[in-house]
């Protein structure tokens, strides 16, 4: 490894003390200590002296050493000093410094192959945080951690869980790295605990004074409530000062409970902390095994330890730090490793190593020495010191000390339990119960949310949750009579409790078994299995099993008229209408029908579509079709429409008419016999265990339970069962499911459902009951049972029941059909979609009418003015036409005036070329007239053109004009002809072919 050349320019301004080895010594070790750890240096020298005097370990060889002091948080200085030690030649490096410098020494030791024994040291007795040294999976990791890993997260989490704290505050001093308990904070947050953090400054008095100056009375009271549960992560000196300040300023009361955790707390610190505190105090510290025989306390095998280190009465031993003990055991471990190497004659001489040279080689004997140290082990002041595969010391033990609640200062302290990574907590942290007088007793109550037994009534941020319900009313009645107070919390797993495979219990019962709660109350049934592990009061309410089902109800859909057909079928029908209409149009276009004279019909695409749609809705059509192909097409279409309309009508009646058949499930027996509706219960609940026990019992006569168990146990219970009762209720409400559960709970749900969509069936025989669970051997069982009997005899219990289960509820519990739907008439909601379709058609037709009116007015505005109108003497025209159309001997025959019948005519609406029979043409004269000629002479209209052509000589046509016509009234006046309908007829002047057809005043205006 190449070290930066910058190290060459570092000044040697740090004080160092060297104890040089004698020229013939082959055992030389180096030590680097924090400059504030003077006691580490003293213990190190004492350990070397004790071992040099022990001729059984090192017979002829003596240990020499070199010690240097550095700033624990200066990695450059630590590397510089380590290089100086390696340059002298050392077999191993011992360091007692901070984590920052330890990482640099780890890299240097790995490069030089020097065994490095690291003792983590905290600043001024503050609790340690994990160093997080990088461990390589290869064999080139030469750093061994003498002190065990930091287990503060695991220990404090176990203790807080044992005490069942839900809200507390953590105080830590300014020297502590709060990241050390990050894992603990994450886990308690996942469990829903309310945790606050506050840093304690060095000037504690000033900090407390600032709190009183800045907080209002309400805020200060809330802060006092927070201090009832607190954890102190700080050095012993700061903890003593902090406790004294908060006690003197009355920030804490006698009901407070504080936990102090620190590996460095000694016996003197424990006595002082207990003396200054009030309320309950729990102390967590690291402990080491001590021989029971006093005379053997200073002996570890064949080695004798100096009395100043092992005698509890010695002042030096009383004030020793944890790192001092591990320093001594480290030297003892190295001495035994050296002895092992000498015995095996596998000794590797020391080598002078240079960190600065680029081509410097590591020590060849480093790997062999490291393996000897790792495989060895000693029993010293800290107990067994050995290393695992990861290079760490796994042996650690914590001691949990505590006091009981009390008002007087200076209470006694006792050992509550111990903790280690292998077995966990050993012991009970529950304090002793007070006397039978329950005045002032605070009980911890665990519950499970279950309507209407226990429900959350108020959940305000920053305040404890408030609960209500039937069980809470019973608990309040007991509390008011007996005088105790209680703190309530919800079971972490929200379960009532059932035995596990390892013999433990979970849920509410598990909280009582592990003594984390004093009382358990909810919809908790009394069962034989539960009575084996906890105590129950007398039942305060009867219990029976019920079934929750959903009523048969009508589905309201405003577009129910569309329900008989699927959306895809509607789309196919619409496409079929368009397709058939198009085919009808094409067939008539390819083979047009021959219509009778005078018919005004037209087979356009629009008319074809309209005809197809009209026939589909059975309203007929206006366009007659005479071709064989078209008629075959329409015949098939009419048959299709008949079947579709008939199917729609029948299916619509089925959809709009509700079949109100009473449910066949009226009991548990009915439920077990059917398989259409799946059913289940809460997994591992009392109902689940009851059905399982009955269903698997070969001597059970009733087959109902075996049938129910087969349904409930599908897929090992995961298919039809739920984890919570609320999930089962929701499953019934929104699916095809029946929920088997406590009848009292189901009745409350059915009564208070806003939609009245539930009904219940079940067994009315109460073979069990609900009770209050207590710890096994609790002194409160009898007094609770007695008070419950008094409430039942006085009728107060019935009053509480009627509060939550009223007799006259808004819903019927036992009817499987909604009473509101028993009528036979359809309501407006069922056919609202039809009205919507009609309204849409009306609105659309009105819009089209407005557009047509606008278009007609716009088109009419283009008609020429009255000044440009030309008048025509239609009577003169009639005479001339009559003269042309009659025989030669009757040249003066005229039409009867009464035969002239002029009707309004819109040129735009004239038929197409296919109806030419309806129009009389004067082809050569460019005069076109409509069929206002009487019917009896219509046949003459076709010869009119030829006669005119032969009887007149055409001259040049000077111009082509258009204009409306007028004719004379019988009284000789003029009036506008009915043909004057905002349209024009083209005409040209008739040329003179030998006849004088000029303008004649008597004949009126000519065309």
Curated annotation (Swiss-Prot):
The identity of this protein, by name, is Glutamate receptor ionotropic, delta-2
Gene Ontology BP annotations: cerebellar granule cell differentiation; excitatory postsynaptic potential; excitatory synapse assembly; heterophilic cell-cell adhesion via plasma membrane cell adhesion molecules; positive regulation of long-term synaptic depression; positive regulation of synapse assembly; prepulse inhibition; protein localization
List, in alphabetical order, the Gene Ontology terms for molecular function in this entry: identical protein binding; metal ion binding; PDZ domain binding; scaffold protein binding; transmitter-gated monoatomic ion channel activity involved in regulation of postsynaptic membrane potential
Can you quote the domain comment? The PDZ-binding motif mediates interaction with GOPC.
**Which residue positions does Phosphothreonine occur at?**
886
What topology does the record note for this protein and the membrane? Answer: Multi-pass membrane protein
Q: Which residues are glycosylated?
A: 293, 426, 713, 716
Disease linkage: Defects in Grid2 are the cause of the Lurcher phenotype. Heterozygous animals display a characteristic swaying of the hind quarters and jerky up and down movements following cerebellar Purkinje cell degeneration during postnatal development. Homozygous animals die shortly after birth because of a massive loss of midbrain and hindbrain neurons during late embryogenesis.
Short motif (PDZ-binding): ranges:
1005-1007
User: What is this protein's function?
Assistant: Member of the ionotropic glutamate receptor family, which plays a crucial role in synaptic organization and signal transduction in the central nervous system. Although it shares structural features with ionotropic glutamate receptors, does not bind glutamate as a primary ligand. Promotes synaptogenesis and mediates the D-Serine-dependent long term depression signals and AMPA receptor endocytosis of cerebellar parallel fiber-Purkinje cell (PF-PC) synapses through the NRX1B-CBLN1-GRID2 triad complex.
Catalysed reaction equations from the record: Ca(2+)(in) = Ca(2+)(out); Na(+)(in) = Na(+)(out)
Q: What residue ranges are annotated as transmembrane?
A: 567-587, 636-656, 831-851
Q: Quaternary state and partners of this protein?
A: Tetramer; dimer of dimers. Interacts with EML2, MAGI2 (via PDZ domains) and AP4M1. Interacts with BECN1, GOPC, GRID2IP, SHANK1 and SHANK2. Interacts with CBLN2, but not with CBLN4. Interacts with CBLN1 (via C1q domain); the interaction is CBLN1-NRX1 complex formation-dependent; CBLN1-binding is calcium-independent; CBLN1 hexamers anchor GRID2 N-terminal domain dimers to monomeric NRXN1 isoform beta; promotes synaptogenesis and mediates the D-Serine-dependent long term depression signals and AMPA receptor endocytosis.
Region span, Interaction with CBLN1 homotrimer: 24-345
The residues exposed to the Extracellular compartment are 24-566, 657-830
Q: Where in the cell is it found?
A: Postsynaptic cell membrane
Impact of mutating residue 920 to A? Abolishes interaction with SHANK1 and SHANK2
Q: Which residues carry this modification: Phosphoserine?
A: 883, 890, 1006
């Amino acid at each position: 490894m190449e070290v930066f050349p910058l190290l060459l320019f570092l000044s040697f301004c740090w004080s160092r003390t060297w104890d040089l080895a004698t020229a013939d010594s082959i055992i030389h070790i180096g030590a680097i200590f924090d400059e504030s750890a003077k006691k580490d240096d003293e213990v190190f020298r004492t350990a070397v002296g004790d071992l040099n005097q022990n001729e059984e370990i090192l017979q002829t060889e003596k240990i020499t050493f070199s010690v240097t002091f550095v700033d624990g948080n200066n990695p450059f200085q630590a590397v510089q000093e380590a290089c100086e030690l390696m340059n002298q030649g050392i077999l191993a490096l011992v360091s007692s410094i901070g984590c920052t410098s330890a990482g640099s020494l780890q890299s240097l030791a790995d490069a030089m192959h020097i065994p490095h024994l690291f003792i983590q040291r905290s600043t001024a007795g503050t609790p340690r945080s994990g160093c997080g040294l990088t461990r390589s999976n290869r064999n080139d990791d030469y750093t061994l951690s003498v002190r065990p890993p930091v287990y503060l997260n695991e220990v404090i989490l176990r203790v807080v869980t044992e005490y069942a704290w839900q809200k507390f505050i953590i105080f830590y001093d300014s020297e502590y790295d709060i990241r050390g308990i990050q894992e603990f904070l994450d886990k308690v947050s996942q469990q829903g605990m309310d945790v606050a953090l506050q840093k304690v400054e060095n000037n504690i008095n000033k900090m407390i004074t600032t709190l009183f100056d800045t907080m209002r009375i309400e805020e200060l009271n809330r802060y006092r409530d927070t201090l009832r549960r607190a954890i102190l992560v700080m050095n012993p000196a700061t903890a003593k000062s902090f406790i004294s300040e908060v006690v003197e300023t009355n920030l804490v009361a006698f009901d407070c409970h504080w936990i102090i955790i620190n590996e460095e707390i000694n016996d003197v610190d424990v006595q002082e902390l207990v003396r200054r505190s009030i309320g309950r105090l729990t102390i967590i510290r690291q402990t080491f095994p001590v021989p029971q025989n006093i005379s053997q306390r200073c002996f570890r095998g064949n080695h004798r330890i100096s009395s100043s280190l092992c005698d509890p009465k010695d002042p030096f031993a009383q004030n020793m730090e944890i790192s001092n003990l591990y320093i001594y055991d480290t030297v003892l471990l190295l001495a035994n490793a050296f002895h092992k190497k000498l015995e095996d004659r596998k000794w590797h001489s020391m080598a002078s190593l240079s960190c600065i040279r680029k081509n410097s080689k590591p020590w060849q004997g480093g790997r062999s020495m490291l393996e000897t140290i790792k495989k060895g082990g000693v029993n010293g002041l800290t107990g067994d010191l050995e290393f695992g595969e990861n290079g760490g010391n796994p042996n650690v033990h914590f001691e949990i000390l505590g006091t009981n609640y009390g008002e007087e200062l200076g209470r006694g302290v006792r050992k509550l339990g111990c903790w280690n990574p292998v077995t966990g907590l050993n012991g009970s942290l529950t304090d002793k119960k007070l006397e039978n007088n329950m005045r002032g007793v605070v009980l911890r109550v665990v519950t499970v949310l279950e309507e209407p037994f226990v429900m959350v009534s108020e959940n305000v941020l920053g305040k404890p949750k408030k609960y209500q319900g039937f069980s809470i009313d019973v608990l309040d009645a007991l509390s008011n009579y007996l005088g105790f107070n209680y703190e309530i919390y919800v079971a972490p797993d929200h379960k009532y409790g059932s035995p596990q495979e390892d013999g433990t219990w979970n849920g509410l019962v598990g909280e009582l078994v592990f003594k984390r709660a004093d009382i358990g109350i909810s919809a908790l049934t009394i069962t034989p299995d539960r009575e084996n592990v906890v105590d129950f009061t007398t039942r305060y309410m009867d219990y029976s099993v019920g079934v929750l089902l959903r009523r048969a109800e009508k589905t309201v859909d405003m577009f129910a008229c569309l329900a008989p057909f699927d959306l895809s079928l509607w789309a196919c029908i619409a496409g079929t209408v368009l397709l058939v209409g198009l085919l009808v149009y094409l067939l008539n276009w390819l083979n047009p029908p021959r219509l009778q004279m005078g018919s005004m019909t037209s087979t356009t695409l629009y008319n074809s579509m309209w005809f197809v749609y009209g026939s589909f809705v059975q309203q007929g059509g206006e366009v007659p079709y005479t071709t064989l192909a078209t008629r075959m097409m329409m015949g098939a279409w009419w048959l299709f429409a008949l079947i579709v309309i008939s199917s729609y009508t029948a299916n619509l009646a089925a959809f709009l008419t509700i079949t109100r058949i009473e449910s066949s499930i009226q009991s548990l027996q009915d439920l077990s016999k059917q398989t259409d509706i799946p059913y289940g219960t809460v997994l591992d609940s009392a109902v689940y265990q009851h059905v399982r026990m009955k269903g698997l019992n070969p001597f059970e006569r009733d087959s109902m339970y075996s049938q129910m168990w087969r349904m409930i146990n599908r897929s090992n219970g995961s298919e039809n069962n739920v984890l919570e009762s609320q999930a089962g209720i929701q499953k019934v409400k929104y699916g095809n499911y029946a929920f088997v559960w406590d009848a009292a709970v189901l009745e409350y749900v059915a009564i208070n459902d806003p939609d009245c969509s539930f009904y219940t069936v079940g067994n009315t025989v109460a073979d069990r009951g609900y009770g209050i669970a207590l710890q096994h051997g609790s002194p409160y069982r009898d007094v609770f049972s007695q008070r419950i009997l008094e409430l039942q005899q006085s009728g107060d219990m019935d009053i509480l029941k009627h509060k939550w289960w009223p007799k006259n509820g808004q819903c019927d519990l036992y009817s499987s059909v909604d009473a509101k739907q028993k009528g036979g008439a359809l309501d407006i909601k069922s056919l609202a979609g039809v009205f919507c379709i009609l309204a849409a058609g009306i609105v659309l037709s009105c819009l089209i009418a407005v557009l047509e009116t606008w278009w007609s007015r716009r088109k009419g505005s283009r008609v020429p003015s009255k000044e440009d109108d030309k008048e025509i003497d239609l009577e003169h025209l009639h005479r001339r036409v009559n003269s042309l159309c009659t025989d030669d001997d009757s040249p003066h025959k005229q039409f009867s005036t009464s035969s002239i019948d002029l009707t309004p005519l819109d040129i735009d609406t004239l038929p197409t070329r296919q109806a030419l029979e309806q129009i009389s043409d004067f082809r050569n004269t460019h005069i076109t007239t409509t069929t206002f000629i009487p019917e009896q002479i219509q046949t003459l209209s076709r010869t009119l053109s030829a006669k005119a052509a032969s009887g007149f000589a055409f001259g040049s046509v000077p111009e082509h004009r258009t204009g409306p016509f007028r004719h004379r009234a019988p009284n000789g006046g003029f009036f506008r002809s009915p043909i004057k309908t905002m349209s024009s007829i083209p005409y040209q002047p008739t040329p003179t072919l030998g006849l004088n057809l000029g303008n004649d005043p008597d004949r009126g205006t000519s065309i």
